[in-house]
Amino acid sequence: MGAETMESPSLFLCKGLLLTASLLICWNWSTAALLTSKEMRFSAAEGAKVLLSVPDQEENLLSFSWYKGKDVNENFTIAHYKKSSDSLQLGKKVSGREEIYKDGSMMLRAITLEDTGFYTLQTFKAHGQQEVTHVHLQVYKIVTKPYLQLNHTRLKRKSASILTCVSPDTGVDINWFFNYKPLNATERITLSPEKRELTISPVWRADVGIYLCEVSNSFSSKKSYPLLMALAYG
């Protein structure tokens, strides 16, 4: 019976890295397999372009492949580049919006919410070095411009007024403005739990003016057109 070979221990490190779009990078180094495993995170707004770039890839680079998802599998190949022949082969998961660069980076153009997920870069370098980088892309929705609705077109003093911030977006933050300054809630001026409705009861002369609402998420914000609230007399 042959002698058993003891597998070399691996070292796992996880360190924060501050980049323009990257949030986290971790790596797992195995001296036995000369294999390095990393994870990076990027975020961008829908409709934009984003460069998925892994640092320090160009030196001693022989070839690399990009995959859709976390599996290194031919069926999920986006593209494969071979330096010796300067050739680029497209795979089954190419969408036509990719640009592949010789340093191993990949540009995605006109990204959509469906592009959110993992991408994997596999690189082969001199001396048998292999590196696998899992890149997570988070695509954020650009919010839609909201608009204001008023429950009555003719308001009278001491009546109740309800303004509604209308937006098709969900999971957003809503802020209100009066005469272009942040509006503070009071006993008379209250907000619904999701802040989509602003109720003024009773309406006073001091409430006459311009109202706006703003819808925002982590990546974008938009304000409604101003609405002038006035009182009717007689």
Swiss-Prot record:
Keywords: Disulfide bond, Glycoprotein, Immunoglobulin domain, Signal. Pfam families: I-set, V-set. Transmembrane segments: none annotated. InterPro entries: CEA_cell_adhesion (IPR050831), Ig-like_dom (IPR007110), Ig-like_dom_sf (IPR036179), Ig-like_fold (IPR013783), Ig_I-set (IPR013098), Ig_sub (IPR003599), Ig_sub2 (IPR003598), Ig_V-set (IPR013106). PROSITE patterns: IG_LIKE (PS50835). Detected in placenta. Glycans are attached at residues 28, 75, 151, 184. Residues 1-32 form the signal peptide. Residues 146-226 form the Ig-like C2-type domain. Disulfide bonds join 165-213. Belongs to the immunoglobulin superfamily. CEA family. This is Cell adhesion molecule CEACAM15. It comes from Mus musculus. The lineage of its organism: Eukaryota, Metazoa, Chordata, Craniata, Vertebrata.
